[in-house]
Amino acid sequence: MTMTDPIADFLTRLRNANSAYHDEVTLPHSKLKANIAQILKNEGYISDFRTEDARVGKSLIVQLKYGPSRERSIAGLRRVSKPGLRVYAKSTNLPRVLGGLGVAIISTSSGLLTDRQAARQGVGGEVLAYVW
């Protein structure tokens, strides 16, 4: 059976592993998921990620990040644009997550960008997810 929304599956697996205080989570690999993981790493929400060749396909292994007393670095993840209802934003109307404390991940013609990077470059696109 094919997966309807692989990005929502990626975010749900991260959310569940984070809630259970797992150190890492293994996911099916895709370029889009690797790019989202790169944004999460650059913004400080995860410590690292790597790609491994599995018996069937590739796997993306994400190492979650916690504070000194095991407080979570990811407080929340939310899928915004879904297969049944796509959400787009112009460069002049980009969303701000928690007044700038969180990050919106936006798929643009320049690749995946955060809301701040997209505003700086003056591009809009599909709002994939919010992370805070």
From Swiss-Prot:
UniProt entry tagged with the keyword Nucleus: no
GO molecular function: rRNA binding; structural constituent of ribosome
Domain of life: Bacteria
GO cellular component terms listed in the entry, alphabetical order: ribonucleoprotein complex; ribosome
Keywords, alphabetical: Ribonucleoprotein, Ribosomal protein, RNA-binding, rRNA-binding
InterPro entries: Ribosomal_uS8, Ribosomal_uS8_CS, Ribosomal_uS8_sf
Function summary: One of the primary rRNA binding proteins, it binds directly to 16S rRNA central domain where it helps coordinate assembly of the platform of the 30S subunit.
HAMAP family named among the record's database cross-references: Ribosomal_uS8_B
Protein name per UniProt: Small ribosomal subunit protein uS8
Source organism of this protein record: Mycolicibacterium paratuberculosis (strain ATCC BAA-968 / K-10)
Gene this protein is translated from: rpsH
